[in-house]
Design a protein with these regions (language model features):
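Toprim catalytic domain recognition across nucleic-acid enzymes
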Residues: 2-203, 211
């Protein structure tokens, strides 16, 4: 079934077969543009919009982050050269406390039984991919048909084109892998160098104080 909106055509056949479709954006303002482009009578709810077979929700930038060393071992909260370099065998992640409410809203939506399709509408790039993949990981999304919307602008025509041509999320696994790798590199460099430099300055200050 083709739906025409202001000279733009959107294929709604897939979404009409069974369950609902979720469109998850990187920020509220972008989510609003997607909602406008869909021309659906949405009802505003806490952290999302819903109308008919469509749900539009959003992140607020990053909702999930990499855990600090003390999440691996409480003893690592105390800085010491003896614990450097810190290189975990497996990396841990956690929901950012300040945005936990929105994460839980998004998690509940993505894992709803009546949701069949998830259209990933985070920014088209490595960081946008990473933002969604972390949410997907921590929310435990399984059994959904995930499609990646890749657009160059937020015009209605571009949004509808992006939805119609959305590819399976697996097409972007390499991009996701590179995002995870870059984040791990930044994390290891940041944690180890900041601790080493800070601890060095602390020891130097203590030495001067004792002279």
């Amino acid at each position: 079934m083709l739906q025409e909106n202001n000279n733009c055509v959107i294929d709604t056949e897939m979404r009409d077969i069974m369950g609902k479709s979720v469109y998850i954006a990187e920020k509220p303002s972008v989510a609003q543009e997607f909602a406008k482009a869909l021309h659906v009578n949405f009802t505003r709810k806490d952290g999302y919009l819903e109308g008919g077979d469509h749900i539009v929700t959003w992140c607020v930038g990053h909702l999930v982050t990499m855990s600090y060393p003390d999440a691996y071992d409480p003893n690592l909260k105390r800085w010491s050269f003896d614990t450097l370099p810190f290189i975990p065998k497996e990396f841990k992640y956690e929901v950012i406390p300040a945005v936990a409410k929105q994460f839980n809203i998004v998690k509940d939506i993505l894992t709803r039984d009546d949701v069949e399709y998830i259209y990933v509408c985070t920014d088209s790039g490595r960081e946008g991919e990473y933002i969604y993949r972390l949410v997907r990981q921590e929310a435990g999304v399984k059994g959904k048909k995930e499609r990646r919307v890749w657009i160059d602008s937020q015009t209605e025509e571009e949004i509808l084109k992006g939805i119609n041509t959305a590819k399976d999320i697996s097409e972007y696994d390499n991009l996701s892998d590179s995002a995870y790798l870059r984040a791990k590199e930044d994390y290891l460099m940041g944690i180890n160098f900041s601790r080493a430099v800070s601890y060095t300055h602390l020891r130097a200050h203590e030495t001067k104080a004792n002279l």
